[in-house]
Each structure stands twice: as structure tokens, then as C-alpha cells.
Amino acid sequence: MMKTLSSGNCTLSVPAKNSYRMVVLGASRVGKSSIVSRFLNGRFEDQYTPTIEDFHRKVYNIRGDMYQLDILDTSGNHPFPAMRRLSILTGDVFILVFSLDNRESFDEVKRLQKQILEVKSCLKNKTKEAAELPMVICGNKNDHGELCRQVPTTEAELLVSGDENCAYFEVSAKKNTNVDEMFYVLFSMAKLPHEMSPALHRKISVQYGDAFHPRPFCMRRVKEMDAYGMVSPFARRPSVNSDLKYIKAKVLREGQARERDKCTIQ
């Protein structure tokens, strides 16, 4: 199955198995959108704008193979619990963000981590077993200093203790401290190409009307070890119906993969 993205004179076909969604969750004013902005364009915005829900898409050409990463930057207020549950169900990798100078935001991350594990476990019919999920818990604003800290490092690290699919980082989106390292570890845990990390691919800047022109991206000759990444200016949040179909297809693929593994072992 291929996902086809079309614009202008160019068509990009991304295999379904190479399409992923990253979901960013946390309380309001903890810096979720700032971390996403660092990932997409390396910039930091000082002005705070409340997020209802932002959707972004980044397309990669890594050694000739196409990959797609959708990024869902969620609201910290979560006025619609059903939509947040749907966002969790569609997620492949997760970033849970709290502010090191805000104890309540850390408590929210603990609740979110529990909810994600419960929702994903139910999806896999493993209600008594934690789902294996690539997840980073991110303590943001470490540039504020120790006097402002309300969450000890040792306490935050307990949330990831004993889980090889979960890691903890203290970062500063403002100073761009540990942000690249955090994404590198997250993608490594998810078994995604390392080149999807912000620092490990060439960024292609494109004009809105020329985003998928053959020469800048999809028909460009790439060297064997080259990796390119491009933020799509046309990304739209999929409909609820599309998300439900996405979940169904993902569960089906995972089931088929487990059956293949059983046959191989036998």
C-alpha cells in the first residue's frame, strides 16, 4: 500500500510502512510547540500562542527511500477527551513535555503516560501488559536554572526506569539544548532511520507554490548516503474517518507481521 502526495508536476509515493505519526502531549505553556518548531525549522518563537491542535508533515528521501512523518502538536487544555484518545491511538512515537519549573505539568505527564499505555494496550488486546511504545519524556526549560526547578531529575527518571522504549531528557527549546539528541534517541527506539533526526539530513527550503517541483526534491539525483527532508506546506489534519482507517490498517499490518514471525519461528 502506498500513500500518494501530489502537487504541481510531481507525485511523491510513500509506502504505508514508511509513514509514521509523532504525537506531542503535555500541559499548556510547557513548550510543546517550541520543541516542534525546533524540529521543523530550527527556530524558536518568544511569543506564546495557545495551541488548539497543529498538524505538520515532513517528507524525507533517505538513500532513495521515501518516508513520511506526521507531527501532531496537541492542545494542553484537551477540551475534547475523545479527540485526545484518537490522537493517542494514531500515534507511533510520543513526546510528553513538562516544564521543569512547574510541578503540575509534571503530574500531567504522569497521567498522560498512564493513559497512553492503557489505550495502546487495549488496542493490542494486552490489557494486563504494557504496550511497547517509543516515548520520550521531556523536561523543558532547563535554562531557567536550579533555583526555579520544581521537579528533581531523579524523580523524573523514575518514569522511564526499566523501560527500554522510554527515555528522559532535560532540554531547552529556547537555547536548543539536547533537542537534537532527544529526537535521535526517540527515532532510534522506534527503529526509524537516524537521518530523520534534525541534524542528520539536508533541509530543503521550498516556496509554497513550488513545494513538490521535480528538481528540488522528488526527481533529484541523490547519492547513496544522502538524506533530504522537506516540511510540507500543504499538510492538513486527516479527518476522523481517515484516522480510524489508519488505525485499522496499522493493526492489520501488525497482526500480519506477528503471523509472519510465528511462521518463521516454527
Curated annotation (Swiss-Prot):
Protein location: Cell membrane
InterPro entries (UniProt xref): P-loop_NTPase (IPR027417), Small_GTP-bd (IPR005225), Small_GTPase (IPR001806), Small_GTPase_RasD (IPR052236)
Keywords attached to this entry: Cell membrane, GTP-binding, Lipoprotein, Membrane, Methylation, Nucleotide-binding, Prenylation
Short sequence motif named Effector region, residue ranges: 48-56
Topology of this chain in the membrane: Lipid-anchor
Protein's UniProt name: GTP-binding protein Rhes
PTM annotation, UniProt: Farnesylated. Farnesylation is required for membrane targeting.
Propeptide: 264-266
Gene3D superfamilies named among the record's database cross-references: P-loop containing nucleotide triphosphate hydrolases
Database matches in PANTHER family: GTP-BINDING PROTEIN RHES (PTHR46149:SF1), MIP08469P (PTHR46149)
Statement: the UniProt record of this protein carries the keyword Magnesium: no
Family recorded in the similarity comment: Belongs to the small GTPase superfamily. RasD family.
GO molecular function terms listed in the Swiss-Prot or TrEMBL record: G-protein beta-subunit binding; GTP binding; GTPase activity
One GO CC annotation: synapse
GO process annotations (BP): locomotory behavior; positive regulation of phosphatidylinositol 3-kinase/protein kinase B signal transduction; positive regulation of protein sumoylation; signal transduction; synaptic transmission, dopaminergic
Binding site for GTP: 26-33, 73-77, 140-143
Species, as recorded: Homo sapiens (Human)
Note: Reduces cell survival in striatal cells with Huntington disease by binding to mutant Huntington disease protein (mHTT; poly-Gln region with 82 repeats) and inducing sumoylation of mHTT.
Region described as Interaction with GNB1, GNB2 and GNB3: spans on this chain: 189-235
Species lineage: Eukaryota, Metazoa, Chordata, Craniata, Vertebrata
Summary of subunit composition and partner proteins: Monomer (Potential). Interacts with PIK3CA and UBE2I. Interacts with GNB1, GNB2 and GNB3. Interacts with HTT; interacts with mutant HTT (mHTT) with a much higher affinity than wild type HTT.
Annotated function: GTPase signaling protein that binds to and hydrolyzes GTP. Regulates signaling pathways involving G-proteins-coupled receptor and heterotrimeric proteins such as GNB1, GNB2 and GNB3. May be involved in selected striatal competencies, mainly locomotor activity and motor coordination.
Source domain of life: Eukaryota
Tissue/organ expression: Pancreatic endocrine cells (islets of Langerhans).
Lipidation (S-farnesyl cysteine): 263
In-chain residues carrying the UniProt-annotated modification Cysteine methyl ester: 263
